[in-house]
Amino acid sequence: MRTEARGGERRRGAGRPRRLGGSMIAAALVAVVLVHGTARAAEEGATPHEPSKFGADWQSWHANTNVTDMPSVQRGARNFVSYCLGCHGLKYQRWSRLGTDLTIPADLLQKELLPPGDKLTNYIHTSMPAKDAETWFGKTPPDLTLMARARGPNYLYQYLKTFYVDPSRQTGVDNLRFPSTARPDVLSELSGMKRAVFRDVMAKGEGGQSVHQQVFDHFETLAPGRLSDSEYDGFVRDTVNFLDYVSEPAQAARRALGVWVVLFLLVFTWLAWLVKREYWKDVH
């Protein structure tokens, strides 16, 4: 009886390596799906909104960045140099790295993007002195190298799309994403001038009392810009896409390498399971 009991325990234990191996393979498959899905989601983003329909849903607008879209990143670099570099720098990024990653020849980079007197080996700095900037704007414009990682591409996209005329502000404009911003709307020649229309709503304040609140409703165009709504939307997406790349230049390579690493682990797990099964076959 004791021998039979032990034999039964061995038979029950013999199935454990198989179940364990199956679980390991299943876990590896799930990991592959998650990594692939995350990379795709990061590249594709959410469904874009219709740029001509400005409304109260601005907080759900998505940049839909894709740093592997090289033409978009290249256009974004051009946009940044033309409209942003005068105030904002990229102090952790070199011109040479920019040219290499964006496949821009050195002579073309020197001709089209580099400021006069700058070198390819230099970091990308703004020419505006920090003290002068603080005097003019009340604070020094931030460096944008890591802004996309700190705030997220969607934040930058919404910020650049929600400027509106406000005569009470020193710069003449304000922003929905960043109220009381010190930044002037340097892109108004492209986007045009818009007025924000707010509506009164009743809300509960302190002590449960009803209070009036101003809630954004929609934009009204006061003066058209050089670009149509869809063209300006593409301009902003390219610019944000470039800043997303700058925040982590190796992210495209990292995602591609990550898939191969997970596949390697999957194959290694399967081989390890085969060895384990062969080993336990002799034991049982």
Where are these regions (language model features)?
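Short, aromatic-rich amphipathic segments at membrane interfaces
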Residues: 224-258
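Sec/Tat signal peptide C-region and signal peptidase I cleavage site
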Residues: 37-41
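Electron-transfer interface patches adjacent to heme c in soluble/periplasmic c-type cytochromes
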Residues: 103-207, 216-232
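Electrostatic cytochrome c docking/interface patches
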Residues: 43-46, 50-78, 89-100, 247-255
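The canonical Cys-X-X-Cys-His
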Residues: 80-91, 239
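Juxtamembrane interface at the cytosolic side of transmembrane helices
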Residues: 257, 268-284
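Bacterial N-terminal signal peptides
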Residues: 26-34
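Bacterial N-terminal signal peptides that target proteins for export
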Residues: 4-26
